[in-house]
Amino acid sequence: MTCSILVGGAWGDEGKGKCITYLCGNDKPDIIARAGVGPNAGHSVEFNGEKYGLRLIPSGFVHTDAKLMIGAGVLVDKDVLFKEFEDLKKYNVKERTFVDPRCAIITKDHRERDKKSEHLAKKIGSTGSGCGPANSDRVLRTVKLANDVPELEDYLADVSLETNDVLDNGGDVFIEGSQGFALSLYYGTYPFVTSKDTTASTFAADVGVGPTKVDEVINVFKAYITRVGEGPFPTEISQEEAESKNIEEYGVVTGRRRRVGLFDMELAKESCRINGATQIALTCVDRLYPDCARTQSYDDLSAETKKFVEEIQSETGVPVTIISTGPDLKDTIDLRKELL
């Protein structure tokens, strides 16, 4: 049995969606479990020529034999969930998705409070999804749980029990985190952070898996850094410089333009240390080094790219096992057999 957790190494938008889709398609886990805050972050998935922006359903949905679980630590907006059921109908997502009855529920009131809050909407740069107010109500013990929502009755399951049963019987579980380390309520650039911790240990707790059962922690970084909203960004470059490097990105949930910066080695080292990373996945290498676009062999990477990868490994002490060189799943260099 193996239990792997995938986490974002910076401020989110690291390319977790593609990594999850690739890893789940290749490794074929029995359960893919969503951890993290809730529908305030979007994962982009490109598969068979189609693009999907997901906020609750695990990005590994393309592995159609897996059960899809949403852990107790995740906030659920039933409207978002049901829309994704419809959007992913051909993958039979509705029939194999299960929500822990202890998930807290986001309501219209939470969304309105989020959007109307001068502090959250303007200073912090909240996505307006209602996650902050919902987590606040959870702390106050006034929030509704999934068990209280009749429309969710057919989708309820004890996620912790099911994931641990699979692991205890030799199966494989993949835990999908959201956002990124630098947005952690505890370790991020406070107060410009999200409404809970976003590290690997919390993602395990979100799903109800104990730390002794976790085998791999895969920390995802882009070859450059991006950030949506306000807050410190030490390596930020101007929009003009970003455009000169052909980098222009927009958030999946908000549509806001992402700020761009150079790779931050100090952030990477701290992220790997606190997450307990055992592997690094490096994405968007083709954006920084266009001559490496769609490369599928490490030997075919340019000397400059290899030097960059080796520097990350040397500084963090963590092997770079996955290198993404394009948006398609086949544009991936998988070095796990060689390095692990």
From Swiss-Prot:
Name the residues that bind GTP. Answer: 12-18, 42-44, 258, 284-286, 324-326
Gene Ontology, cellular component aspect: cytoplasm
Task: Provide the E.C. number(s) assigned to this enzyme.
Answer: 6.3.4.4
Required co-factors: Mg(2+)
Q: Where, per UniProt, does this protein localize?
A: Cytoplasm
| Catalysed reactions, semicolon-separated | IMP + L-aspartate + GTP = N(6)-(1,2-dicarboxyethyl)-AMP + GDP + phosphate + 2 H(+)
Alphabetically sorted, this entry's keywords are: Cytoplasm, GTP-binding, Ligase, Magnesium, Metal-binding, Nucleotide-binding, Purine biosynthesis
Pfam families reported for this sequence = Adenylsucc_synt
Q: Does the keyword DNA damage apply?
A: no
Top-level EC class, please?
ligase
The pathway to which it is assigned is:
Purine metabolism; AMP biosynthesis via de novo pathway; AMP from IMP: step 1/2
State where IMP binds: D13, E14, G15, K16, N40, A41, G42, H43, T127, R141, Q179, T194, R256
Main subcellular localisation: cytoplasm
- State the similarity comment: Belongs to the adenylosuccinate synthetase family.
GO terms of biological process kind? 'de novo' AMP biosynthetic process; IMP metabolic process
Q: Which domain of life is it from?
A: Archaea
How does this polypeptide assemble, per the annotation? Homodimer.
InterPro entries the UniProt entry points to: Adenylosuccinate_synth_dom1, Adenylosuccinate_synth_dom3, Adenylosuccinate_synthetase, P-loop_NTPase
Identification of the protein by name: Adenylosuccinate synthetase
Role noted for this protein = Plays an important role in the de novo pathway of purine nucleotide biosynthesis. Catalyzes the first committed step in the biosynthesis of AMP from IMP.
Which organism does this sequence originate in?
Methanobrevibacter smithii (strain ATCC 35061 / DSM 861 / OCM 144 / PS)
